[in-house]
Amino acid sequence: MSGKIPKYFITELLSRTNIIELINTRLELKKYGKNYQTNCPFHHDKTPSFTVSNEKQFYYCFGCNAHGNAIDFLIQYEHLSFIESIEELALIHGVKIPFENTVQNSIYVKKQKLYLLMEKICKLYKKNINVTHLANKYLARRGINQNMIDFFLIGFSSLKWNEFYKKINISKEFEQELLINNIIATDKNGYIYDRFQGRIIFPIQDNHGRIIGFGGRSLNDMSPKYLNSPETDIFYKRKQIYGLYQVIKKCSKPVYLLVVEGYIDVITLTQYNIDYAVSILGTSTTTEHIQLLFKNTDIIICCYDGDDAGKNAAWKTLKKALPYISDKKTLKFILLPNQEDPDTIIRKEGREKFQKRIDNAITMSKFFFKNILKNINLSSDDDKFHLSVHALPLINTISSDTIRIYLRQILARMIGILDDNQFEKFLYEKETKNTQKTYFQIKRTPMRTLIGLLVQNPSLAKLVPVTMKFKNLQIKGLSIFLEILQTCRDNPNIHTGQLLELYRNTTIINVLKILARWDHMIIQKETQNMFLDLLMNIHDKILEKRREYLIAKERKKGLQMNEKKEIWSINKKLSKR
């Protein structure tokens, strides 16, 4: 990726980024000595093993080996690509990325144009609703007040595309891009039209509040009733959640998120001060949705219609969520009466009664067994067998030992395992998959320790005298040390996170990452002394090797006068040690 985004820009971007602040917006960090700690988000972590260093701008988990700088964190935590993580940081700091690659730059420019165009179209939709009687009549009938219209930027599309074209002032070239991306379309006569014409518009925003797409609801019998924007370079339905931006804007870490099915449901619940309602965009729940929801809350409450379709949707959601459930993260369910949805029922019952439904939501374990026991006769041995075969693979996908064993315990009692030995074996039976990971390790040597100290403390480079000569490059690891030393000298204020970023995708990056997290078992104030001692010892080793070479040469063919002076100088230096 270094050929696409200049290294100087990435280094500058990391210098503007405080990794503590970045991670703290997503995880709750607590100060521990000079570092910060929390439970690792990348594995089931019972005690805090995720450490973040403000000094090094680097994180490391002692449990699962996750590590890196601010860019790596966004890649791992947000499931972004390298370039997407750079774009995220650039957006946070309000800077433009100077792509070197013309293709990548054109993609970036195209995305920025799309954001701007979506914003313009949204404003036009919003302006249009204020002067459209039909749209206002519909919203009034649905009981949606002006505050909600403004808060969710609700609009209406009744204009022909040529009116958009004139008001937004876009080029023909970009109009073609919109056609290619299916944002606009052509009819059988070749006329361009707005896909949302005649619909109430619900703008969809990303986590920064940027408009990335729209949902449209028809006011007549037009099919389909609901229509979403086609996917583009900035809009992916399987990754977006309607209303999440509004929730996070009010509360950065809500106690729970209530997942409902429609745009109107979210808006009505918010109007009734249920400020944590969100919606999947008219599609089935994906693993990306589950991960995004759990990043923002510890409790997901899914509210579905009580008919068969709603129950099936809830069951599918639970199966998708099982691998992400932990001791702290869980799922609950509300199944509404038939022919009811959150919008209709809260208007009938009021907020207080609806809140009771939330408070009494069905727990994950109860919902799991309620569904798994459908059509099962527990007095039948065959049914017990089928129950076990069906339930165990699902239970085994749960990463939490506590929850997994608890569900197995319930299952064991159901199928009649009462013998203590059999029961114990059933509960703690090893998983078929090997969960142990093997990590790349390297042996400790003085040279690697020296490099490790420099990687962790780049400012130590100033302690190495410029006059100190390193002529013998055959000493293992010396070339790497000299390479890192020069990089630190060229970038006087560089920190560990920036240093590692400069070596991303190089042959030595894996070694450098290991050295960056080595514990040298010394107090901080002794770091400088240890570094200098190792430096002098290695320099002495270089001098000794050079002296051995010159002595061997003298025996074979003699030395030049300058080489004899060099031996004398080496002997003098070594005698002072």
Curated annotation (Swiss-Prot):
Provide the reaction this enzyme catalyses: ssDNA + n NTP = ssDNA/pppN(pN)n-1 hybrid + (n-1) diphosphate
Q: Does the keyword Lyase apply?
A: no
One cellular-component annotation, GO: DNA-directed RNA polymerase complex
Protein's GO biological process? DNA replication, synthesis of primer
Q: What does this protein do?
A: RNA polymerase that catalyzes the synthesis of short RNA molecules used as primers for DNA polymerase during DNA replication.
Q: Which HAMAP family match?
A: DNA_primase_DnaG
What is this protein's record name? DNA primase
Name of the encoding gene:
dnaG
